[in-house]
Amino acid sequence: MIKEVIVVEGRDDVTAVKRAVDAEIIAVGGFGINAKVINRIKEAQKRQGVIVLTDPDHAGEKIRRIISKRVPGIKHAYITQKEGFKDGDIGVENASPEVIIKALECAKCEIKEKRQEFDIQDLIYFKLTGDIKAKERREAVGRELGVGYSNSNQFLTRLNNYGITREEFIEAVKRIDV
């Protein structure tokens, strides 16, 4: 598993990266990078580091600059226009898994053991799934931990992939229960 969180532009890019590597991925949704997304990227940078992999075009470079300006110290992975070209379209979503792996290796990504600190029983115990207010509780805990909102399965993945400690998790739950 790649240690750093990979930041891409959109959902199709997420799919392409997931075909290539096991990693936590944030999709910024194009130019509409809002404060919530930037804060998730900042938190990811603090916890594991971030690698930005955007399309090899003007829009991709602009998004890369916006993120770089707001989140210092991130790494950058690049694909060429030729590597990302298919049927008249240029983008990460068109790159082969081999090209994406090579780009991440050039960005000096780190490999780590997949972590399983948390499981579904933790979410059930803390009423983050299987409870009428589970969605609101996950949203609040996600905000406290800087991992954002997600469904139960994705929330569990983020807890494990972002390196959240059990102590941090319990403290976040306590803060929302006040």
Predicted regions and their residues:
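Short, polar loop motifs at secondary-structure junctions
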Residues: G10-D13
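Short active-site oxyanion
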Residues: M1-V5, Q48-I51
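Short, flexible loop segments at the rims of nucleotide/cofactor-binding pockets, characterized by
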Residues: I2-K3, A27-G32
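Well-ordered beta-strand positions
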Residues: V5, A23-E24
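TOPRIM fold recognition
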Residues: R19, A23, F31, A35-V178
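Charged, low-complexity surface patches
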Residues: I6-V7, P56
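Phosphate-handling DNA/RNA-contact segment within nucleic-acid enzymes
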Residues: M1-K3, T15, K36-R40
